[in-house]
């Protein structure tokens, strides 16, 4: 689980996110719906990825997002895999918007 501060899924909330790489969790109310990551291209920072979700360029599956959390990580792909494995162990499945990715 990503611990830390909850942020409103809004331009103001996203503006407080650093231009770094890491992982993020998107929520519909109090339900976790997606674990994502940012890495690779310099434009694919946490802030950039969250803005892409907000603008709809990541598809319609995360349109219901109301809040998010994030974590700066040196190895985002590995951290995302750890988060997905933990969620699946506890819930018997991955978050609903990660289903097509698993």
Give the positions of each predicted feature.
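Basic nucleic-acid-binding interfaces
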Residues: 62-65, 73
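Generic low-complexity, intrinsically disordered sequence content enriched
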Residues: 2-5, 50, 54, 87-88
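Coupling/hinge elements of helicase-like and P-loop NTPase modules
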Residues: 90-101
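A generic structural signal for short, non-catalytic loop/turn and secondary-structure boundary residues
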Residues: 19, 60-63
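GIY-YIG nuclease catalytic motif and its immediate N-terminal context
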Residues: 1-44, 71-85, 102
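A broadly used, surface-exposed interaction patch
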Residues: 45-61
């Amino acid at each position: 689980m990503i611990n830390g501060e909850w942020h409103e899924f809004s331009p103001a909330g996203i503006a407080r996110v650093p231009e770094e790489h890491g992982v993020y969790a998107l929520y519909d109310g109090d339900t976790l719906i997606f674990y994502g990551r940012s890495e690779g291209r310099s434009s694919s920072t946490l802030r950039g990825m969250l803005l892409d979700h907000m603008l709809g360029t990541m598809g319609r599956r995360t349109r219901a997002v109301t809040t998010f959390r994030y974590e700066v990580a040196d190895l985002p792909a590995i951290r995302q895999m750890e988060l997905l494995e933990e969620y699946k162990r506890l819930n018997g499945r991955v978050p609903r918007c990660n289903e097509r990715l698993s």
